[in-house]
Amino acid sequence: MGYCGTGAGMEKVTRGLEATVSRGPDDCRIIDLKDGVLGFQRLSIMGLTPEGMQPFELNGNYLVCNGEIYGFEKIKSELISKGYTFKSGSDCEVLLPMYKEYGTDMFAKLDAEFACIIYDSAAHEFIAARDPIGIRPLYYGYDAEGEIIFASEPKNLVGLCDKILPFPPGHYWKDGKFICYRNISEPERTCH
């Protein structure tokens, strides 16, 4: 869950996450950033050590992700050859180094099902993204102050946002806009 603003975000994220404790019963972490708040409830599947707990951090940037990154071992090896180090066996830990290398172009490079939120500390901005098919859920809404809030389930946003909307698959949100990075209704190749 991510609150992209400075008005009582910690309280809002805490309240929102309480609605889905059963979804991530293994651990919960909320971090208060300069420009907002990120919260994560953990269901330990991969990277079962404490180091696999999110939000992940790299050079002041943070990430929460509900996802499965296919072939992450190959991506991880490529990133290690570029000097990156990893603390856990979690597949999602490769995402922040990918963001550092490729920026938002990383989303089109992924073979994955995911819903993620990145905090870029240098730009003081949040970026949210969802896989092209929309396998992993992601919703958003705006609070009374007009700040956007993202969550994996609509019930995380009930009472925080007047209107709750599904995040469009194959898009990322940055600078207040949704940007399509992959439209599966327009295939790049066809078979004959």
Across the structure, where does each feature detected by a protein language model lie?
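Cysteine-centered catalytic environments shared across enzyme families
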Residues: M1-H192
